[in-house]
Curated annotation (Swiss-Prot):
Cofactor: binding details: Binds 1 Mg(2+) ion per subunit.
Domain of life of the source: Bacteria
Signal sequence interval, chain numbering: none
GO cellular component: cytosol
Keywords: Amino-acid biosynthesis, Aromatic amino acid biosynthesis, ATP-binding, Cytoplasm, Kinase, Magnesium, Metal-binding, Nucleotide-binding, Transferase
Lineage: Bacteria, Pseudomonadati, Pseudomonadota, Gammaproteobacteria, Alteromonadales
Gene Ontology terms: biological process: amino acid biosynthetic process; aromatic amino acid family biosynthetic process; chorismate biosynthetic process
Binding residue positions for Mg(2+): 18
Catalysed conversion reaction: shikimate + ATP = 3-phosphoshikimate + ADP + H(+)
Cofactor(s) needed by this chain: Mg(2+)
Residues reported to bind substrate: 36, 60, 82, 139
One Pfam family linked to the record: SKI
Protein name as it appears in the record: Shikimate kinase
Binding residue positions for ATP: 14-19, 120, 156
Amino acid sequence: MAEKRNIFLVGPMGAGKSTIGRHLAQMLHLEFHDSDQEIESRTGADIAWVFDVEGEEGFRIRETQVVADLTEKQGIVLATGGGSIQSKEIRNNLSARGIVVYLETTIDKQVARTQRDKRRPLLQVEDPREVLENLAATRNPLYEEIADVIVKTDEQSAKVVANQIIEQLGF
Protein backbone atom coordinates (compact mmCIF):
# COMPACT_ATOMS: atom_id res chain seq x y z
CA MET A 1 0.00 0.00 0.00
CA ALA A 2 2.04 2.93 -1.27
CA GLU A 3 -0.27 5.70 -0.14
CA LYS A 4 -1.82 5.60 3.31
CA ARG A 5 -5.53 5.83 2.79
CA ASN A 6 -8.15 6.23 5.46
CA ILE A 7 -10.75 3.58 6.19
CA PHE A 8 -13.93 4.75 7.88
CA LEU A 9 -16.23 2.19 9.48
CA VAL A 10 -19.93 3.02 9.64
CA GLY A 11 -22.88 0.99 10.81
CA PRO A 12 -25.33 0.57 13.64
CA MET A 13 -24.41 0.12 17.28
CA GLY A 14 -23.43 -3.45 17.90
CA ALA A 15 -22.12 -4.00 14.36
CA GLY A 16 -18.56 -4.35 15.68
CA LYS A 17 -17.04 -1.11 14.36
CA SER A 18 -14.62 -0.61 17.27
CA THR A 19 -13.54 -4.24 17.60
CA ILE A 20 -13.18 -4.79 13.86
CA GLY A 21 -11.50 -1.40 13.48
CA ARG A 22 -8.78 -2.31 15.98
CA HIS A 23 -8.07 -5.57 14.12
CA LEU A 24 -8.07 -3.81 10.76
CA ALA A 25 -5.70 -1.07 11.92
CA GLN A 26 -3.31 -3.60 13.42
CA MET A 27 -3.33 -5.78 10.29
CA LEU A 28 -2.71 -2.78 8.00
CA HIS A 29 -0.28 -0.99 10.36
CA LEU A 30 -2.54 2.07 10.56
CA GLU A 31 -3.60 4.23 13.50
CA PHE A 32 -6.95 3.33 15.04
CA HIS A 33 -9.40 5.97 16.26
CA ASP A 34 -12.89 5.66 17.72
CA SER A 35 -14.99 8.83 17.51
CA ASP A 36 -16.90 8.03 20.72
CA GLN A 37 -13.66 7.45 22.64
CA GLU A 38 -12.28 10.71 21.26
CA ILE A 39 -15.38 12.58 22.45
CA GLU A 40 -14.94 11.04 25.90
CA SER A 41 -11.27 11.99 25.91
CA ARG A 42 -11.97 15.59 24.92
CA THR A 43 -14.84 16.09 27.36
CA GLY A 44 -13.39 14.09 30.24
CA ALA A 45 -16.76 12.37 30.59
CA ASP A 46 -18.50 9.32 29.17
CA ILE A 47 -21.05 9.45 26.36
CA ALA A 48 -23.99 8.84 28.73
CA TRP A 49 -22.98 11.91 30.76
CA VAL A 50 -22.71 14.06 27.63
CA PHE A 51 -26.22 12.91 26.60
CA ASP A 52 -27.59 13.63 30.09
CA VAL A 53 -26.07 17.09 30.36
CA GLU A 54 -26.09 18.34 26.76
CA GLY A 55 -28.76 16.16 25.20
CA GLU A 56 -28.40 14.34 21.91
CA GLU A 57 -28.09 17.63 20.04
CA GLY A 58 -25.07 18.69 22.13
CA PHE A 59 -23.50 15.29 21.65
CA ARG A 60 -24.01 15.46 17.86
CA ILE A 61 -22.32 18.88 17.71
CA ARG A 62 -19.28 17.43 19.49
CA GLU A 63 -19.36 14.35 17.25
CA THR A 64 -19.39 16.45 14.07
CA GLN A 65 -16.28 18.35 15.20
CA VAL A 66 -14.44 15.21 16.29
CA VAL A 67 -15.14 13.42 13.00
CA ALA A 68 -14.10 16.52 11.02
CA ASP A 69 -10.79 16.60 12.92
CA LEU A 70 -10.09 12.87 12.70
CA THR A 71 -10.91 12.56 9.00
CA GLU A 72 -8.23 15.15 8.22
CA LYS A 73 -5.58 12.68 9.39
CA GLN A 74 -3.90 10.28 6.96
CA GLY A 75 -3.49 6.54 7.31
CA ILE A 76 -6.16 5.85 9.91
CA VAL A 77 -8.98 3.46 10.59
CA LEU A 78 -11.89 5.32 12.19
CA ALA A 79 -14.82 3.67 13.95
CA THR A 80 -17.67 6.18 13.86
CA GLY A 81 -20.66 6.36 16.18
CA GLY A 82 -23.80 4.70 14.84
CA GLY A 83 -25.74 7.96 14.69
CA SER A 84 -23.01 10.06 13.11
CA ILE A 85 -24.36 9.11 9.69
CA GLN A 86 -27.33 11.42 10.25
CA SER A 87 -25.10 14.47 9.82
CA LYS A 88 -24.71 15.58 6.20
CA GLU A 89 -21.39 17.23 7.13
CA ILE A 90 -20.07 13.95 8.55
CA ARG A 91 -21.28 11.99 5.52
CA ASN A 92 -19.53 14.46 3.23
CA ASN A 93 -16.28 14.31 5.22
CA LEU A 94 -16.28 10.51 5.29
CA SER A 95 -16.97 10.22 1.56
CA ALA A 96 -14.38 12.83 0.57
CA ARG A 97 -11.55 11.77 2.86
CA GLY A 98 -11.41 7.99 2.75
CA ILE A 99 -12.96 4.64 1.98
CA VAL A 100 -16.28 4.05 3.74
CA VAL A 101 -17.02 0.51 4.89
CA TYR A 102 -20.56 -0.23 6.08
CA LEU A 103 -20.62 -3.00 8.67
CA GLU A 104 -24.08 -4.45 8.29
CA THR A 105 -25.78 -6.50 11.01
CA THR A 106 -29.26 -7.72 11.86
CA ILE A 107 -31.47 -6.31 14.61
CA ASP A 108 -31.30 -9.70 16.38
CA LYS A 109 -27.52 -9.53 16.47
CA GLN A 110 -27.59 -5.90 17.63
CA VAL A 111 -29.90 -6.81 20.51
CA ALA A 112 -27.66 -9.72 21.51
CA ARG A 113 -24.50 -7.61 21.37
CA THR A 114 -25.87 -4.55 23.18
CA GLN A 115 -28.33 -5.91 25.75
CA ARG A 116 -25.95 -5.68 28.72
CA ASP A 117 -24.19 -2.49 27.66
CA LYS A 118 -25.27 0.39 29.89
CA ARG A 119 -23.11 2.89 27.95
CA ARG A 120 -25.62 3.25 25.13
CA PRO A 121 -28.00 6.05 26.12
CA LEU A 122 -30.49 5.47 23.31
CA LEU A 123 -31.04 1.87 24.45
CA GLN A 124 -31.81 2.62 28.10
CA VAL A 125 -35.52 2.12 27.46
CA GLU A 126 -38.10 -0.59 28.05
CA ASP A 127 -38.01 -1.91 24.46
CA PRO A 128 -34.52 -1.49 22.94
CA ARG A 129 -35.48 -3.68 19.96
CA GLU A 130 -38.08 -1.12 18.90
CA VAL A 131 -35.50 1.66 19.18
CA LEU A 132 -33.03 -0.34 17.06
CA GLU A 133 -35.70 -1.03 14.43
CA ASN A 134 -36.59 2.67 14.23
CA LEU A 135 -32.93 3.68 14.01
CA ALA A 136 -32.33 1.10 11.26
CA ALA A 137 -35.22 2.46 9.20
CA THR A 138 -33.69 5.94 9.32
CA ARG A 139 -29.98 5.19 9.25
CA ASN A 140 -29.48 2.09 7.09
CA PRO A 141 -30.29 3.92 3.82
CA LEU A 142 -27.69 6.57 4.78
CA TYR A 143 -25.03 3.92 5.50
CA GLU A 144 -25.76 2.34 2.11
CA GLU A 145 -25.69 5.71 0.35
CA ILE A 146 -22.08 6.50 1.29
CA ALA A 147 -20.62 2.99 1.52
CA ASP A 148 -17.82 2.03 -0.84
CA VAL A 149 -17.95 -1.51 0.57
CA ILE A 150 -20.64 -3.38 2.55
CA VAL A 151 -19.64 -6.28 4.80
CA LYS A 152 -22.02 -8.40 6.89
CA THR A 153 -20.76 -8.95 10.44
CA ASP A 154 -23.27 -11.50 11.77
CA GLU A 155 -21.87 -14.88 12.80
CA GLN A 156 -18.28 -13.93 11.96
CA SER A 157 -15.35 -13.06 14.18
CA ALA A 158 -13.90 -9.56 14.07
CA LYS A 159 -10.68 -10.92 12.58
CA VAL A 160 -12.54 -12.69 9.76
CA VAL A 161 -14.48 -9.52 8.96
CA ALA A 162 -11.26 -7.46 8.99
CA ASN A 163 -9.73 -9.92 6.51
CA GLN A 164 -12.81 -9.66 4.28
CA ILE A 165 -12.50 -5.87 4.28
CA ILE A 166 -8.81 -6.07 3.34
CA GLU A 167 -9.64 -8.49 0.49
CA GLN A 168 -12.49 -6.34 -0.83
CA LEU A 169 -10.33 -3.22 -0.73
CA GLY A 170 -7.45 -4.98 -2.47
CA PHE A 171 -4.90 -4.10 0.22
